[in-house]
Amino acid sequence: MRDRKWSRRDVLKASAVSATGLLFAEPLRAAAPPPTAVTPDLIEAARKEGKVSFYSALELNTAERLARTFEAKYPGISVRVERSGAERIFQRIAQEQGSGINAVDVANSTDPSHYLEWKKSDWLQPYVPEEVAKYFPADQVDPDGTHATSCAWMEVIGYNTDLVKREDAPKSYADLLDARWQGKIVKAHPGYSGAILTATFVLARDLGWPYLEKLAQQKVMQVQSAADPPKKILLGERAIMADGNDYNLVLLKDQGKPVEVVYPAEGAPLIIVPSGIFRGAPNPNAARLFQSFFFSAETQQMLVDVFAHRSFHAQVREKGEHIPLANLKMLKADPAAVQAQSEEIKARYTKIFGV
């Protein structure tokens, strides 16, 4: 059981034995609960539980910073971080829930379609932090209150400025097909990374699978996480990255490293990262407190300033080095379509790239 990999089809089967106990039952939907403020009673109840488990697809240093900051703000409550790629987190939660194991309190994923699955399976507990209700746009909050967008970023092209002159650097996805870049490109994998799964869906939709077939002929170095391509071009193992997180490059540039961000002419995939509480959370009050902390202006500003993420919180200032989202051409995914096509995308990508 432990070694089994769960697909979205398995999740739907597992939902049949969820808390409802009704085969193929569709959970009843209700309006989102009223916004909840952080009160002394909530803090005290969370302290009595003493811990919270946070499953996260954010980079480990980001997830750990969130955990340690929360622990400093609320002494007596420890945070256990379980960090992995979004698709691995999805499989783990499916396995746990399908086995009747309630281990996760709060989960965030770089694949928004996961929340559609979890919501349909009735695994998410509606909870709306006060600041989400006040300061987040409606399109970044689930109407039923089961999740909201905790942060965002863009998947971009990038290059090592010691290896590629600015005037020669690719400006578009089409430019990556130039013969000069053969054997010089690195790319992340949609079978591991939820962000890259979303980006692959967008590129297949807008540029077509023939584009990806041509890109595969460029002798691309294949890595797992969307955070890996920036590391490879920094080390000079490859000159160009075909995808990867813009925030990694922004942070490296802040350190004076020889990398540059390219927002492709065709547009860059927007990656949103929802967060939600699980209905069977073993530490429900600590989960609520952590979720409210996650969406607070203070925490959101930290994610922007320290980790170069994007925030939809109305009171949070954009990082100075960032091109404002309003000035960028964004390629937005449809989570429901990603959900429906996920397994096909992974299989087709693996066949095309041979990995």
Give residue spans per PLM region.
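N-terminal secretory signal peptides
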Residues: 1-10, 14-21, 25
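Extracytoplasmic ligand-binding site segments that recognize negatively charged/polar headgroups
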Residues: 53-67, 79-97, 102-230, 234-237
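A ligand-binding cleft/hinge motif common to bilobed small-molecule-binding domains
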Residues: 113-117, 239-258
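Short beta-strand->loop
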Residues: 124-133, 145-148, 174, 251-269, ...
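Periplasmic-binding protein-like
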Residues: 152-153, 180-191, 212-216, 222-223, 255-281, 293-318, ...
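A bilobed periplasmic-binding-protein/Venus flytrap-type ligand-binding module shared by bacterial periplasmic
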Residues: 158-163, 201, 271-283, 294, ...
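Extracellular/periplasmic bilobal clamshell ligand-binding domains
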Residues: 319-355
